A protein has these predicted regions:
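Intrinsic disorder and flexible/low-complexity segments
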Residues: 3, 28-31
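Intrinsic low-complexity/disordered segments
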Residues: 13, 31-34
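Bacterial N-terminal signal peptides
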Residues: 17-29
Length: 227
C-alpha cells in the first residue's frame, strides 16, 4: 500500500505521516562512487545463522523529535553496541542493543545538554537505553518486525521494531569474519517514558501518536557460525 493510499484511507493522521516522512527522508541513499558501490552488501532475507557483534564504529541510532508540536529536532547517538543472533527459526532470532545516551548529538551543544538533563534522558541516573527481544515475524519478503523491550529513562515498554536485512558484504578479506548490515525503524511517545513534561504535546492530540521517530543503522561482524 502506498503512502498516498494510506493517507486517503485515513489510517495515518498528520503527525504519523510526518514521522513516516522523516523515516523516508533519513533512509534516502546518499551518492556513492564506483569504488563504494563495489562494497555494497548483497541482499538476502536474513544473514546466515549465527551470532554477530555490532560494530560501534559503523552503527548509529537517529531520532527526530517533535519540538513544541510543530517543530522537529533531529539528532543521533554515536555509541551503539550489542549482539544479534540470526537463526533459520524466526522464533530464535534475537537482538540485544545498548545505546550510550550521553553520546547523543543534535549539533547544538546547549540543546544537547538540555536533552541529557533530568527533563529528558537524565543521563547521570540513566546512562544507557537498551532494546532487547527474541523472535521476529515477517511482514514482507525482506521486512521483519520484532516486539522487543525498549528500556529508556528507567521505564521498560514493548516497542515493535521494523527492520530489513540489507545484506552481507562481499569484499571481506580472507580470514576476517563475515559482515552484515541492518536498517530498523520505530516510533515512541516520550511521555510514556516520563520525558518532556514541559513540551505541551497534548495539543492537537499529540499524546495519542508517536512524537519521536527512531532509526538505527547497524553493521555487525560474525562471532560464531554453525558448523
Amino acid at each position: 500500500m502506498t503512502l498516498k493510499n494510506i493517507l486517503n484511507k485515513g489510517i495515518l493522521n498528520r503527525i504519523e505521516a510526518a514521522a513516516l516522512l522523516l523515516a523516508l527522508i533519513l533512509a534516502l541513499p546518499v551518492g556513492t562512487t564506483h569504488a563504494q558501490q563495489s562494497k555494497r552488501p548483497t541482499a538476502s532475507t536474513l544473514p546466515p545463522p549465527g551470532a554477530y557483534k555490532i560494530d560501534s564504529d559503523h552503527s548509529f541510532a537517529y531520532f527526530g523529535a517533535r519540538h513544541h508540536v510543530f517543530g522537529l529536532v533531529r539528532g543521533r547517538f554515536d555509541k551503539v553496541t550489542g549482539t544479534i543472533t540470526s537463526s533459520n527459526d524466526p522464533a530464535a532470532c534475537a537482538i540485544d542493543v545498548v545505546i550510550d545516551v550521553a553520546s547523543l548529538s543534535t549539533q547544538i551543544p546547549e540543546r544537547d545538554e538540555d536533552i541529557r538533563s533530568p527533563v529528558y534522558f537524565d543521563v547521570k541516573k540513566f546512562p544507557t537505553m537498551t532494546y532487547r527481544g527474541r523472535g521476529i515475524r515477517r511482514v514482507s519478503p525482506n521486512s521483519w518486525v520484532m516486539d522487543g523491550t525498549l528500556t529508556m529513562h528507567g521505564i521498560a515498554k514493548t516497542v515493535p521494531l521494523s527492520f530489513n536485512f540489507n545484506g552481507a558484504f562481499t569484499d571481506i578479506k580472507p580470514g576476517n569474519p563475515a559482515r552484515v548490515a541492518f536498517h530498523g525503524t520505530t516510533g515512541v511517545k516520550r511521555a510514556e517514558f516520563g520525558m518532556g513534561a514541559r513540551d505541551n504535546l497534548d495539543e492537537l492530540g499529540m499524546l495519542t501518536t508517536p512524537d519521536v521517530a527512531i532509526e538505527i543503522d547497524v553493521e555487525a561482524d560474525a562471532t560464531s557460525m554453525p558448523k
